[in-house]
Amino acid sequence: MSLPDFTMRSLLDAGAHFGHQSHRWNPKMEPFIFGTRNNIHIIDLAQTVPLLHQALKAVSDTVARGGRVLFVGTKRQAQDAIADAAHRSAQYYINSRWLGGMLTNWKTISASIQRLRKVEETLQGGGSGLTKKERLMMSRERDKLEKALGGIKEMGGIPDLIFVIDTNKEQLAIKEAERLHIPVAAILDTNCNPDGITFPIPGNDDAGRAIALYCDLIARAALDGIARGQGAGGVDFGEADQPPAEDLPAADLPAETPEPTTAVTEAYEAPAEAFELLTAPRGAPDDLGKLPGIGPQIVKKLNDAGLYHFWQIAAMTPEDAAKTDHDLKLGGRIERDGWVNVARSLVAA
């Protein structure tokens, strides 16, 4: 894989160049403003393109070193895109509300995460010994904790880089990251303050299409980092169960027929390797912790059950996934967190 490609045209089509009304601006953003049209500031995308590329490279390098990226976007327009991008790239996210101390008071946050796990285990076990009211109260507690901490419950520590949509709304997250010297990549609209942002990306932080584009690019950069990390770790793609997928430039694709795309889709839907459990790993086991929502305890549970490699999970049919989830009492994690799709991306990387 390689860093995701994008063009100024793709940014224009997404509306990334539209800023806020000219009277709602932060003077510190003046260097990134191209001009004004109908009292709306226009962002200079000629600067956005290289700055966005720098941010993508930083994300890829961070993940390639084994680092963790935290996606942060709690505004309504960003919530779904943030969660989807984090799931697809096996990273972490906050899309509900930033709780004070999420980074600077990780010890307390970890205690809340442990409580969430304990509640989940109790409810997955049927809640025996609890009254109906106690089960209801526990379910509500689980839902509340899951909403606040579900995106980071498997993070295992503070992230190595955070990606932020809307620095005005996420000021607390940025201040905590700055205090801990965590690099920040952030989308900066014309009403934002670029101070303290390690990798500034001038762009519209309100339009849904623009937010979706940013998140997709960051997610793909993280997947590139995962692939590079596997290569640096000695993964021999020549001996892989499935060959890595290569992205062909548009000019190299057939002009009319979509057959190659269809073939790739079918390959994903019906992988060559059939799903099977192993008595021992074939060579070095994969780092299953790269799958979303997986921590050391779940990795051990999967290994004990005979799951060591991404290709095994990628080969799962819906029936295989449901049976494995039931047998290991995973509480619907395989389907909910998209393990199969992420595993297929990692196998193809």
Swiss-Prot record:
InterPro entries: Ribosomal_uS2, Ribosomal_uS2_bac/mit/plastid, Ribosomal_uS2_CS, Ribosomal_uS2_flav_dom_sf. Gene3D superfamilies: 5' to 3' exonuclease, C-terminal subdomain, Glucose-6-phosphate isomerase like protein, domain 1, Helix hairpin bin. One of its GO terms (molecular function) is structural constituent of ribosome. SUPFAM superfamilies: Ribosomal protein S2. This is Small ribosomal subunit protein uS2. The gene is rpsB. It comes from Methylocella silvestris (strain DSM 15510 / CIP 108128 / LMG 27833 / NCIMB 13906 / BL2). Keywords: Ribonucleoprotein, Ribosomal protein. Belongs to the universal ribosomal protein uS2 family. Pfam families: Ribosomal_S2. One of its GO terms (cellular component) is cytosolic small ribosomal subunit. GO terms for biological process: translation.
